Amino acid sequence: ASDKGVTYESIEGDSSIQLAYNTMEIPPRAEFQLVLSDGTKVWLNAGSKLRYPERFVGDERQVELSGEAYFDVVHDEKAPFIVKTSRSTITVLGTEFGVRDYEGKANLTTLVQGRVAVCDSMNKSYVIYPGQQVIIDERGTTVEDVETAYFTSWKDGYFTFNQATLGDIMDELSQWYDFDCFFTNSTVTNLRLTARLKKYDDINVLLDILSDTGDVCFSRKGRAITVTEISR
């Protein structure tokens, strides 16, 4: 049955137990922190959706994510914590990690503490350690060493970019500020910039900071932002 967005499902094998599921959906320019029934903390970024049970039962704790979230998982060796996304299944006991799974973008699992196993759509499993990231995209699955702060600072109120392409930067800003971005030529998307920006600043403040590099300028009309490379 369904009532005001909460779906009730029976657990297979025990019809006497009814499990209530909640779905948390985050709009643009918003984020939300919640605590699950086992004490696990979850930070949800803009444009994300988390489906989770009101209480965990049985020998696993499973949630479903689309978008981006950061998890601080309570340790329970008898009940692994499982995050399912469109392209991966992440299994943990107790740890801190970030997951990004926006449509049309690379699927990222970034480990801050502990250890996790990431299973991709080909059922190949990758065990990673703190400071490592699993990347799933059209080329396949890879594991890289990363500076985790660049991928998790969003939960602390910042966008952090280190030699990121302007295309990736504008993708992330558009996810938060809900605008459409247009580039006057394809080469401008490959410009690399380093910046630390406050998430709750007005978008015009952030564009001014990026334009101070002297490489690009921005024009804005309604929800559309056009990026032009400055000729030297």
Positions of predicted regions on the chain:
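A residue-level detector for the "anchor" residue at the start of short, highly conserved motifs
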Residues: 1-232
